[in-house]
Regions:
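Residue(s) in the substrate-gating loop at a strand-loop-helix junction
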Residues: 47
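Active-site-adjacent segment of SDR/Rossmann-fold oxidoreductases
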Residues: 52, 73-83
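Active-site helix of classical SDR
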Residues: 27, 63
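Substrate-binding pocket helix/loop in short-chain dehydrogenase/reductase
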Residues: 3-4, 8-13
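SDR active-site lid
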Residues: 80-146
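A short helix-coil junction within the Rossmann-fold of NAD(P)-dependent oxidoreductases
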Residues: 29-38
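Active-site loop immediately N-terminal to the catalytic Tyr-X3-Lys motif
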Residues: 5, 52-58, 62
């Protein structure tokens, strides 16, 4: 977690390899089996950070936006094979994710954010995820209704200028 100007480019490479290319490679390995079967369902975890911009998340958000672009394109390609694609975009969920965040030099950041303390419980998030997969939803945002992240996704989708106006004023 850091501003782009302070972030070593190696952090981008590390995150792309870990959070993007590993998912693409795994999908490539599994897709042929699904095509041969004539059906399947790909469900992958992304993030609200792949749907809305946030300061100090340039590296992380770019990876998550890349995943959304990849899977949205893939969805169009595999529909003809009866293969569904579900993107799971968590907002604030109580996790230990902050223990693994990296700073500008690629070292552990070591600071939890509000979502890790006050977000949705993992059990409740799992129920939403399982329901989305069962019903072959295109995408699900996992977040409390009161969560700014959910509201941010909504505002950004329908009122992008308003989103950036507000985002400049809110310290996220």
């Amino acid at each position: 977690q850091s501003y782009f100007e302070d972030t070593d480019i190696s952090v981008f490479h590390e995150l792309m390899n870990l959070d993007y290319f590993s998912v693409v490679y795994f999908t490539k390995a599994m897709l042929n089996h699904m095509v041969k079967e004539g059906s399947g369902h790909i469900a992958t975890n992304t993030s609200v950070a792949g749907l809305i911009a946030s300061r100090e998340r340039t590296a992380y958000s770019s990876v998550k936006f890349a995943l959304h672009g990849f899977f949205d394109s893939l969805r169009l390609e595999v529909m003809k094979h009866n293969i569904a694609v579900t993107l799971i975009a968590p907002g604030k969920v109580v996790t230990n994710f902050g223990d693994n965040k990296l700073d500008a030099q690629g070292k552990p950041f070591g600071e939890k954010n509000m979502g890790e303390a006050y977000g949705m419980s993992p059990a409740k998030a799992a129920k939403f995820i399982l329901s989305a997969i069962k019903h072959k939803k295109r995408q699900i945002v996992i977040s409390k209704w009161s969560d700014v992240a959910w509201l941010g996704v909504f505002i950004n989708k329908f009122f992008p200028s308003l989103y950036f106006f507000l985002a400049r004023r809110i310290n996220t």
